[in-house]
Amino acid sequence: MPQQNSYSKEDLVKAGTGELFGEGNSQLPSDNMLMMDRIITISEEGGENGKGFILAELDITPDLWFFDCHFKGDPVMPGCLGLDAMWQLVGFFLAWTGGPGKGRALGVGEVKFTGQILPTAKKVTFKIDFKRVIKRKLYMGLADGSVSVDGREIYTAKDLKVGLFTDTSKF
């Protein structure tokens, strides 16, 4: 598939089955663990550091799976799912730029939670700003990210790290 600057839910589902970037290359999680409904913009230029950025969204509805189990009587989206969404987007960016291999989260320097996502929310926006992209034997992305709900920033992450690996057997 030619490189696009935005992706629909249908495109992202294809990224979860290996159809978007080819067999053996980076895939997004499928089904419930796919944490975005669309990528609004993806670019190798621009962003806070001039090294590329992504803007993506997740529509919130009260029937999303995690609200039933986290927590009973006090439903809130787990913060770790927002963090995972940011890692998913860093990996997607690496594959989108032509990186071979399977994506693996390698860490994060700092995460701060200053709000929550409730079933009454409408939209979550993920913003990823790349600080560095290494394209050698190892493809690796280093980025800062944020999660906003209905226009209010509620999570930030510094130094999100994701790598692409052609062999994950010794990982």
Swiss-Prot record:
Keywords: Cytoplasm, Fatty acid biosynthesis, Fatty acid metabolism, Isomerase, Lipid biosynthesis, Lipid metabolism, Lyase. The keyword Lyase applies. One of its GO terms (biological process) is unsaturated fatty acid biosynthetic process. One of its GO terms (cellular component) is cytoplasm. The active site is at H70. It holds the Pfam family FabA. Pathway: Lipid metabolism; fatty acid biosynthesis. It is found in: Cytoplasm. Its EC number is 4.2.1.59, 5.3.3.14. Its main location: cytoplasm. It catalyses: a (3R)-hydroxyacyl-[ACP] = a (2E)-enoyl-[ACP] + H2O; (3R)-hydroxydecanoyl-[ACP] = (2E)-decenoyl-[ACP] + H2O; (2E)-decenoyl-[ACP] = (3Z)-decenoyl-[ACP]. GO terms for molecular function: (3R)-hydroxyacyl-[acyl-carrier-protein] dehydratase activity; trans-2-decenoyl-acyl-carrier-protein isomerase activity. SUPFAM superfamilies: Thioesterase/thiol ester dehydrase-isomerase. HAMAP family: FabA. Belongs to the thioester dehydratase family. FabA subfamily. Necessary for the introduction of cis unsaturation into fatty acids. Catalyzes the dehydration of (3R)-3-hydroxydecanoyl-ACP to E-(2)-decenoyl-ACP and then its isomerization to Z-(3)-decenoyl-ACP. Can catalyze the dehydratase reaction for beta-hydroxyacyl-ACPs with saturated chain lengths up to 16:0, being most active on intermediate chain length. This is 3-hydroxydecanoyl-[acyl-carrier-protein] dehydratase. It comes from Colwellia psychrerythraea (strain 34H / ATCC BAA-681). The lineage of its organism: Bacteria, Pseudomonadati, Pseudomonadota, Gammaproteobacteria, Alteromonadales. The gene is fabA.
